[in-house]
């Protein structure tokens, strides 16, 4: 089988004096893995994400930023629980970021705070991102009433080109002053978005959002996967991490929905927000927003929530990176 072939090739390479292991200094995998350990793969992925993201839904309705922020309670909730069950603060911070539903952010933070847990954290983050359609709908239905699910939101206003260009510039400046530790991620996110929205660097934006992000994703998956060796991955801590990851997703989804319900108490009737977009604050783009749309259509086939849900969804991307910067600043 393939395993015996790989074992045979590995033995041949070692007999020839060639280094092949990811932890063997000088091997190809080890060189590629430095992009993970030194933390420059995730910022490059954020560059690509910024170049493919349209922030119009958020700019047209800025209060949706608060929904994205509320969903980050999952991160800090999981952090507190991880501390309570025996993880040290740095490990707990790395585990908590799973609740942000952002794989590159989870890898970036865990590579800084808990490199020994990075494989389990990365697998957990990406696994639960894929399980968003399974985890979120029951929570959304349980926490909302029929009348709340039928709320119709105002159509988003048209956003000018000037606003689209100014948003990443202002975002970059605010990030620099408020959360400097998150600058490697958010700085690249806003820079990538500026490439897209400026209109004069279309080729660079297309490269960042296409070939570059695809290449880095392949290298990231290859090296993180190669680092998850059985002796380090199949442990009791890994099981705890998977459990905490699931819990953080539940907390994040619930906190987003509950926040919208509370926020609606202070909004006039025509300005209310459909609580079904509260789940979209979990930054699994665009899966969380699609779930808002799918669940909403079950109760009203003419109520399209996707464009509204994209606001908290992209806000969640920013929020998870801000949370990572806060944890990094306090714990290192």
Residue ranges and their predicted role:
Residues 1-25:
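Phosphate-binding loop of NTP-binding sites
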Residues 30-45, 91-99, 126, 180-190, ...:
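Structural signature of hydrophobic alpha-helical transmembrane segments
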Residues 38-39, 46-52, 67-77, 81, ...:
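Alpha-helical membrane segments and immediately flanking helix-loop junctions
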Residues 55-79, 231-257, 309-313:
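Entry/N-cap segments of selected transmembrane alpha helices
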Residues 80-89, 121-149, 255-269, 315-332:
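Juxtamembrane and boundary regions of transmembrane helices in multi-pass small-molecule transporters
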Residues 116-134, 242-252, 277-280:
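Alpha-helical transmembrane segments
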Residues 124-200:
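Membrane-embedded hairpin module used as a gating/binding unit in multi-pass transport
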Residues 172-260:
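Transmembrane helical segments that form the transport core of multi-pass membrane transport proteins
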């Amino acid at each position: 089988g393939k395993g015996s072939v790989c074992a045979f090739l590995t033995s041949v390479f070692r007999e020839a004096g060639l280094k092949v292991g990811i932890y063997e200094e000088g091997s190809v995998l080890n060189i590629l893995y430095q992009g993970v350990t030194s933390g420059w793969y995730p910022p490059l992925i954020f560059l690509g994400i910024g170049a493919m993201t349209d922030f119009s839904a958020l700019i047209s309705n800025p209060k949706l930023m608060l929904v994205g922020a509320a969903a980050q309670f999952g991160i800090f909730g999981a952090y507190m629980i991880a501390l309570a069950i025996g993880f040290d603060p740095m490990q707990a911070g790395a585990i908590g970021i799973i609740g942000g539903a952002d794989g590159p952010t989870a890898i970036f933070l865990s590579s800084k705070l808990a490199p020994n847990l990075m494989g389990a954290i990365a697998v957990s983050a990406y696994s639960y991102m894929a399980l968003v359609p399974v985890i979120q709908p029951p929570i959304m239905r349980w926490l909302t009433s029929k009348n709340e699910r039928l709320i119709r939101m105002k159509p988003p206003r048209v956003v000018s080109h000037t606003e689209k260009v100014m948003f990443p510039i202002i975002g970059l400046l605010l990030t620099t002053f408020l959360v400097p530790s998150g600058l490697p991620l958010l700085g690249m996110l806003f820079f990538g978005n500026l490439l897209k929205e400026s209109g004069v660097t279309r080729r660079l934006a297309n490269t960042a959002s296409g070939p570059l992000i695809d290449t880095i994703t392949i290298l990231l998956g290859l090296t993180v996967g190669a680092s998850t060796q059985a002796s380090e991955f199949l442990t009791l801590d890994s099981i705890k991490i998977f459990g905490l990851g699931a819990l953080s997703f539940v907390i994040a989804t619930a906190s987003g929905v509950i926040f919208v319900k509370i926020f609606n108490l202070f909004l006039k009737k025509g300005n209310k927000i459909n609580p079904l977009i509260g789940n979209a604050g979990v930054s699994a783009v665009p899966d969380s927003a699609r779930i808002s749309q799918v669940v909403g259509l079950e109760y009203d086939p003419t109520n399209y929530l996707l464009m509204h849900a994209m606001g908290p969804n992209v806000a969640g991307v920013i929020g998870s990176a801000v949370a990572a910067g806060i944890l990094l600043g306090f714990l290192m």
